[in-house]
């Protein structure tokens, strides 16, 4: 283990919410973020159906289940396997939520005839490169996909919560969300680390408007096999061109 890794482990052990999560048997310190967001914005209510995109290790699903209770239902999906829950009304699928075949699996699990959910939540993060321009662009890409899925899966007047890394593309993203929801907020819960660039977009009351393909935010597509430094330079060049227009 390198110095940075050791420092990260030590910092986490000193973290108040990390310790509290261990004590209360939550799977992640992120559980407290959703608690705080829901206390402030009341996006999840008892008896509702919740879809969690990028749910591993399951901390948000635990909190969602506590809120919806026995009469609600919580479905999660993640590329990583999620340890099964003790409740019958909490189910996690291993898979890529950007694939239509996996969305169809989710629809099969939704316990209503219209196959829609009341709330879509996402605490997902992109693969971190260490280059801020790339990581911000990838975060916008991921959260835009989450928004598109929300417009496909939500009941009318449903709610959406998603994490995004703050940066120069966030205003465009928030304006995009406003096309589909009546109320949109940006916030940072107390449980988020102060040094973290993460913020949360809270969108309430989905209008029912169908997703428009032209609403894909113009950005550099994720290129897994391309050198990160080269990709960062490309993003900066694109921004310079946009600023001159």
Curated annotation (Swiss-Prot):
SUPFAM superfamilies: S-adenosyl-L-methionine-dependent methyltransferases. It is found in: Cytoplasm. It holds the Pfam family FtsJ. GO terms for biological process: RNA methylation. It catalyses: uridine(2552) in 23S rRNA + S-adenosyl-L-methionine = 2'-O-methyluridine(2552) in 23S rRNA + S-adenosyl-L-homocysteine + H(+). The lineage of its organism: Archaea, Methanobacteriati, Methanobacteriota, Methanomada group, Methanococci. The keyword Methyltransferase applies. It is an enzyme of class 2 (transferase). S-adenosyl-L-methionine binds at residues 58, 60, 78, 96, 123. One of its GO terms (molecular function) is rRNA (uridine-2'-O-)-methyltransferase activity. Keywords: Cytoplasm, Methyltransferase, rRNA processing, S-adenosyl-L-methionine, Transferase. The active site is at residue 163. Specifically methylates the uridine in position 2552 of 23S rRNA at the 2'-O position of the ribose in the fully assembled 50S ribosomal subunit. One of its GO terms (cellular component) is cytoplasm. This is Ribosomal RNA large subunit methyltransferase E.
């Amino acid at each position: 283990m390198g110095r940075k890794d050791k420092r990260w482990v030590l910092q986490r052990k000193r973290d108040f919410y990390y310790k509290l999560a261990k004590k209360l048997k939550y799977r992640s310190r992120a559980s407290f973020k959703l608690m705080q967001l829901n206390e402030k914005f009341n996006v999840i209510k008892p008896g509702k159906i919740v879809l969690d995109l990028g749910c591993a290790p399951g901390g948000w699903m635990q909190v969602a289940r506590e809120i919806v209770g026995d009469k609600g239902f919580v479905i999660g999906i993640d590329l990583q396997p999620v340890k099964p829950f003790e409740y019958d009304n909490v189910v996690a699928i291993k898979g890529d939520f950007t694939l239509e075949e996996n969305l169809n699996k989710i629809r099969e699990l939704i316990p209503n005839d219209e196959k829609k959910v009341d709330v879509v939540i996402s605490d997902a993060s992109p693969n971190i490169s260490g280059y801020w321009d790339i990581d911000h662009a990838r975060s916008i890409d991921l959260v835009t996909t989450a928004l598109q899925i929300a417009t496909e899966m939500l009941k009318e007047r449903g709610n959406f919560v998603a994490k995004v890394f703050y940066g120069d593309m966030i205003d465009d993203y928030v304006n995009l969300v406003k096309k589909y929801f009546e109320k949109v907020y940006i916030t940072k819960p107390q449980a988020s680390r102060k040094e973290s660039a993460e913020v949360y977009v809270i969108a309430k009351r989905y209008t029912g408007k169908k997703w428009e393909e032209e609403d894909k935010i113009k950005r550099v597509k994720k290129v897994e096999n391309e050198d990160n430094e080269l990709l960062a330079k490309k993003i900066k060049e694109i921004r310079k061109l946009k600023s001159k227009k």
